[in-house]
Amino acid sequence: MSRVIAIANQKGGVGKTTTSINLSACLAEKGKKVLLIDMDSQGNTTSGFGFEKNELDKTIYEVLREEVSIEEAIIPVEECFENLFLIPANRNLAGAEIELVTRENMQHILKKQLEPIKDEYDFIVIDCPPALGMLTVNAMTAADSVLVPIQCEFYALDGLSQLIYTIELIQESLNPDLYIEGVVFTMYDARTNLSLQVVENVKDNLKQIIYKTIIPRNVRLAEAPSYGLPINLYDKRSSGAEAYRMLADEVIENAK
């Protein structure tokens, strides 16, 4: 059975796209068939795999507009793993928030599009935009669960509380089975008191849904996208690669 996981946080710069790319690649490395959907108009997930995003004419934007089928928009990321696939995004997606508002059953468009292909994959990972608009609502309506990356910074808990409120609203009206897959700490620096305090603070409030894996602040993680590679191919022995492999193990275990 396929699992659809939305990776979301309305705060930017928390490691959401980094987590989307590297979790998907590590799941593929472990033999899982993975579809990664870029739902962010910045298209950083798309360019993070080396694709020229603005040269693509079949993206998630055209899928949501129902101009192309979802199968037509899927790109194999065979330079990385033969069982890893991507639905790309580019700047065209920026207009989708406004366009979707006028559509009938606008919150369910992505879910409807995924239905014919959902069972072909072990995991479908959706990289949500850093906002709680219609694109994120579509992703969460289509998802089984939400994975939340949190940067180890002072305002981490404030952003999380807003996201949890949004998830509760979607549970009430659109997707009653949606749940929080887990919270993963990113950009963790054990040398700073702030990182330690943030981890302890969030654990005190949400202990039951926090992943054991903590993603460290790692130079190689920051470098990898400029080479169009996930961390487990760019530097497979780096601390970032090891951390995302451990996170993939936890996600696989949770799916059993």
Predicted regions mapped to residue ranges:
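P-loop NTP-binding core
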Residues: 1-256
